[in-house]
């Protein structure tokens, strides 16, 4: 693929492989995947060739809306808003993302300095579980994630290198509680990622854990 925009419009099926050519650079682009593989036939997002890792420089694109649909334990904590992610895996399972370089830089020209309180939330990889219960078989392997200039204040929003969250489902009686099973993160290198390196959030149900 020479552009990621076509990939975002594809319907991916179990066993499909989306391979980016090594040495290629995708500026102001992103991937948003909402399809799932199976245990025996996972979807693979990866690379081919012999050069450097293919690089996705998102630069604040790939915007989606995060909403825990539940106020947090402090009125000062932000629980909903827009997020920019190089790769978004939304309610997917049995998917492998490997052999990629990801950046998501801020823009000093419009005032996105390190400590700007209104800075865009940013991640390298965002993984979300919401309306399909248990999400299994998420593998992130050999990713080089750096220069992700997220918001250092909004700790419950998706900010950092890799951020996995569970959101309040629309119908918990029908779908069950969203959660993950069999998650593997291996041989990933992260640096200069704010606010977090690798983080997991289950914040929508915070009231069930406070004081436990």
Enumerate the language-model features and the residues they cover.
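Right-handed parallel beta-helix/beta-spiral solenoid domain characteristic of secreted/periplasmic
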Residues: 17-26, 34-118, 147-153
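Acidic Gly/Asp/Thr-rich repetitive segments characteristic of extracellular carbohydrate-active
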Residues: 1-30
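Right-handed parallel beta-helix
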Residues: 42, 46-51, 93-104, 133-149, ...
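Extracellular beta-strand/beta-solenoid scaffold signature
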Residues: 30-33, 61-88, 111-131, 153-180, ...
């Amino acid at each position: 693929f020479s552009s990621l925009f076509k990939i975002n419009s594809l319907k991916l099926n179990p066993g499909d492989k989306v391979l980016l050519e090594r040495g290629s650079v995708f500026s102001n682009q992103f991937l948003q995947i909402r399809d799932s593989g199976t245990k025996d036939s996972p979807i693979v997002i990866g690379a081919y060739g012999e050069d450097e890792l293919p690089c996705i420089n998102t630069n604040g694109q790939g915007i989606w809306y995060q909403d825990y649909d539940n106020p947090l334990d402090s009125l000062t904590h932000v629980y909903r808003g827009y997020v920019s992610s190089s790769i978004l895996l939304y309610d997917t399972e049995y998917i492998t993302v490997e052999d990629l370089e990801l950046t998501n830089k801020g823009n000093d020209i419009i005032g996105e300095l390190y400590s700007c309180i209104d800075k865009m939330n940013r991640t390298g990889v965002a993984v979300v579980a919401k309306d399909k219960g248990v999400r299994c078989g998420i593998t992130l392997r050999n990713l080089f994630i750096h220069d992700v200039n997220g918001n250092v204040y909004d700790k419950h929003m998706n900010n950092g290198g890799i951020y996995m969250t569970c959101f309040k489902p629309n119908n918990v009686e029908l779908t069950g509680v969203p959660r993950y099973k069999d998650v593997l993160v291996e041989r990933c290198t992260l640096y200069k990622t704010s606010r977090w390196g690798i983080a997991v959030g289950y914040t929508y149900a915070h009231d069930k854990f406070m004081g436990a």
